[in-house]
Swiss-Prot record:
<dbReference type="GO" id="GO:0009986">
    <property type="term" value="C:cell surface"/>
</dbReference>
<dbReference type="GO" id="GO:1904348">
    <property type="term" value="P:negative regulation of small intestine smooth muscle contraction"/>
</dbReference>
<dbReference type="GO" id="GO:0046676">
    <property type="term" value="P:negative regulation of insulin secretion"/>
</dbReference>
<feature type="topological domain" description="Extracellular">
    <location>
        <begin position="284"/>
        <end position="303"/>
    </location>
</feature>
<feature type="topological domain" description="Extracellular">
    <location>
        <begin position="90"/>
        <end position="108"/>
    </location>
</feature>
<dbReference type="GO" id="GO:0032570">
    <property type="term" value="P:response to progesterone"/>
</dbReference>
<dbReference type="GO" id="GO:0010628">
    <property type="term" value="P:positive regulation of gene expression"/>
</dbReference>
<keyword id="KW-0807">Transducer</keyword>
<feature type="transmembrane region" description="Helical; Name=5">
    <location>
        <begin position="204"/>
        <end position="229"/>
    </location>
</feature>
<dbReference type="GO" id="GO:1904460">
    <property type="term" value="P:positive regulation of substance P secretion"/>
</dbReference>
<feature type="disulfide bond">
    <location>
        <begin position="107"/>
        <end position="184"/>
    </location>
</feature>
<feature type="transmembrane region" description="Helical; Name=3">
    <location>
        <begin position="109"/>
        <end position="130"/>
    </location>
</feature>
<dbReference type="GO" id="GO:1904364">
    <property type="term" value="P:positive regulation of calcitonin secretion"/>
</dbReference>
<feature type="transmembrane region" description="Helical; Name=4">
    <location>
        <begin position="152"/>
        <end position="173"/>
    </location>
</feature>
<dbReference type="GO" id="GO:1990767">
    <property type="term" value="P:prostaglandin receptor internalization"/>
</dbReference>
<dbReference type="GO" id="GO:1904326">
    <property type="term" value="P:negative regulation of circadian sleep/wake cycle, wakefulness"/>
</dbReference>
<dbReference type="GO" id="GO:0006954">
    <property type="term" value="P:inflammatory response"/>
</dbReference>
């Protein structure tokens, strides 16, 4: 979804003429290129780190957790590589999308790709939050009942989302060129030359289902992460009362709580505006396709474009909030602690080193 990062003025919003895009030179095309490169680097680093950690792990549960993170990074990476080059091509050609894709097949592929990789990322993040909450709040039940391997679950989620995204190909829903004319996504209402009564019920149902599924995934993720934080705090207090490495438990709890809150903040900032705005536009019987033919839609169109840009940021931030940033912070913590210990010649708790799953090792005890 990184490809939608481009200036609003790159295509004339209120004209049906087949004119070249305004400002589609090297400056405007730098946006999607920068987003694609940034996302590629972050997700590629995350995947390399997951592969290295996966080979050193013996516990199936730890391997499942790493597999989920790796799958999330792979999903974000492939989604960017499939969409960004298309948008870059549109900008470099300085032609309207309809001229480059008169059959509409590329638009359908682009919209399907954004739907599959956007929604699957949300659902995988939600599944990870559920598993994390069960493992921490009910460890004995989790150990005895959760025998399902991660790979079938991840494949099931991806195939289910793919089947859902294929509905417009079967006639339920519609993918259309979105303002300013450099990308395609789910249509939320009538096209620019249609009236309100011309809306297809299938398009409304499909767009509503996407928004509701996304919001449901966000709610589940939030609820599970909050439940996990609460359980961690309660266990930390119990350990402190029993004087069982209270300092270490306090540090682990703080680090994990900060990471989970960071995940919630990133998801809410990146996805909530788009999903809520889609429902609002469906309710108001509006589509950003109308921006090309109707005056007075500038505010709504700009807001929707900003919301999509925020959603595209999620693919770049995912590897950092789930893996890379935590690893960097842990390594920095070890460096500071080792320096302090050397200066004071005092003993301390063992350093987690490069282990990304240090906190999960401790929580299982």
């Amino acid at each position: 979804m990184a490809g939608v990062w481009a200036p609003e003025h790159s295509v004339e919003a209120h004209s049906n003429q087949s004119s070249a895009a305004d400002g589609c030179g090297s400056v405007s095309v730098a946006f999607p290129i920068t987003m694609m490169v940034t996302g590629f680097v972050g997700n590629a680093l995350a995947m390399l780190l997951v592969v290295r950690s996966y080979r050193r792990r013996e516990s199936k549960r730890k391997k499942s957790f790493l597999l989920c993170i790796g799958w999330l990074a792979l999903t974000d990476l492939v989604g960017q590589l499939l969409t960004s080059p298309v948008v870059i091509l549109v900008y470099l050609s300085q032609r309207r999308w309809e001229q480059l894709d008169p059959s509409g097949r590329l638009c359908t592929f682009f919209g399907l790709t954004m739907t599959v990789f956007g929604l699957s990322s949300l659902l995988v993040a939600s599944a990870m939050a559920v598993e994390r909450a069960l493992a921490i709040r009910a460890p004995h039940w989790y150990a005895s009942h959760m025998k399902t391997r991660a790979t079938p679950v991840l494949l099931g989620v991806w195939l289910s989302v793919l089947a859902f995204a294929l509905l417009p190909v079967l006639g339920v829903g519609r993918y259309s060129v979105q303002w300013p004319g450099t990308w395609c996504f789910i249509s939320t209402g009538p096209a620019g030359n249609e009236t309100d009564s011309a809306r297809e019920p299938g398009s409304v149902a499909f767009a509503s289902a996407f928004a509701c599924l996304g919001l449901l995934a966000l709610v589940v993720t939030f609820a599970c992460n909050l439940a996990t934080i609460k359980a961690l705090v309660s266990r930390c207090r119990a350990k402190a009362a029993a004087s069982q490495s209270s300092a270490q438990w306090g540090r682990i709890t703080t680090e994990t709580a900060i990471q989970l809150m960071g995940i919630m903040c990133v998801l809410s900032v990146c996805w909530s505006p788009l999903l809520i705005m889609m429902l609002k536009m469906i309710f108001n019987q509006m589509s950003v396709e109308q921006c090309k033919t109707q005056m007075g839609k500038e505010k709504e169109c700009n807001s929707f474009l900003i919301a999509v840009r925020l959603a595209s940021l999620n693919q770049i931030l995912d590897p950092w909030v789930y893996l890379l940033l935590r690893k960097i912070l842990l390594r920095k913590f070890c460096q500071i602690r080792d320096h302090t210990n050397y200066a004071s010649s005092s003993t301390s708790l063992p350093c987690p080193g490069s282990s990304v799953l240090m906190w999960s090792d401790q929580l299982e005890r």
